[in-house]
Amino acid sequence: MELKKLESRAEFEAWQDACKKRFAAQNRKIFVCCGSVCLAEGAMKIYSKLKESLQREGLLCDVVLGTHLEDGAPGFALKKTGCSGMCDNGPLVRIEPEGWLYRKVSADDVEEIVQKTILGGEYIDRLGMGNGTEVCKTRKDLKFFDGQTRRVLRNCGEIDAENLEEAVARDEYSGFVKALFDMTPEQILDTVAEAGLRGRGGPGNISAEKWRKAAACTDAQKTLLVNDGQLDVGSYMDRTVVEGDPHRLIEGMAIVALACGIEEGYAYVHPQYQVAEFRLKKAKEQAEAAGLLGDNILGSGKNFHLHVNAGMRTLPEREFLKMSANSVHSNKKTWYANSYM
């Protein structure tokens, strides 16, 4: 679906309202986890076969928000999402509004899912998860999700990871638009300080302190550098966010840039995170097309240009980012030697 460039706040809000209505009209949703782990287990084959089967049955398949959906028609949506957790049980398929969750799904299971569940309203026990005594049909029945309150990951697994309209329907870019038109840079910094936000890795630096240092810098040109290629073995924190909700990162970078007086940013993605890199680049292109990145964003007079590069740090973060921005290659031996001293 071609995106129209938005020229004002009013145009953004009208578009967001339309996205919300279309999203709400999808009263039947099928979510196929297409995070890296599920993709390696054949998730795209499942997604493609589901799409073919639904179309063969003559069911309306709203694959992309805003297309193939006539007024009054039942909304039937098929979505490829990012990771929602429980990777050892993938590929995962979830069906709403029942909330039914299937694990270890294969392409061979698709016809049974369509016939029994989609058309017949029947849960397939053999594809369900167990807690030792009974089949757990929904996420609410699983201890894995007990006590979880998702904020950064709120939309991961809930939207198509490659669709800007769905992100906007779930309130993404609303915070940026508010900051853009209703707040001064100092008010943004104060809000971040009051929230008590800290870094999620390393020493857990206070975010507002780092932002204030950048805002106070008087250099003629400042650049925002974001590292999405953490080396914490097995953590995949950055990858999960970028794969499942890339517009969340872009909105965050845009708010930082606004608060600190920055007009250019670089996001570095681990070279092995190919899905994350692809989705972040696609999200960047979508945001540019919609007028949420670039020059004179929404007619505000503010500019922010984003670049996405594949890169991996082998030096402490601050040194790596500065060297990389200046096209200087780091020396692996220096990093490994220092890391054990």
Where are the predicted features?
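Terminal amphipathic helices with adjacent charged low-complexity linkers/tails
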Residues: 106, 114, 131-136, 264-288, ...
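Histidine-anchored nucleotide/phosphate-binding helix
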Residues: 245-259
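Gly-rich Lys/Arg/Thr-decorated short loops/hinges at beta-loop-alpha junctions or inter-strand turns
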Residues: 159-162, 167-174, 225-238, 341
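Conserved phosphate/anionic-ligand binding catalytic regions in large, soluble enzymes, centered on
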Residues: 34-42, 88, 193-214, 313-323, ...
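Hydrophobic alpha-helical positions that pack around
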Residues: 277-341
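Iron-sulfur (Fe-S) cluster-binding modules
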Residues: 1-33, 40-80, 95-194, 262-267
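Buried hydrophobic positions in well-ordered alpha/beta secondary-structure cores of metabolic enzymes
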Residues: 38, 50, 87, 110, ...
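Conserved alpha/beta core surface patches that mediate binding of polyanionic ligands
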Residues: 10-13, 66-81, 194-220, 239-245
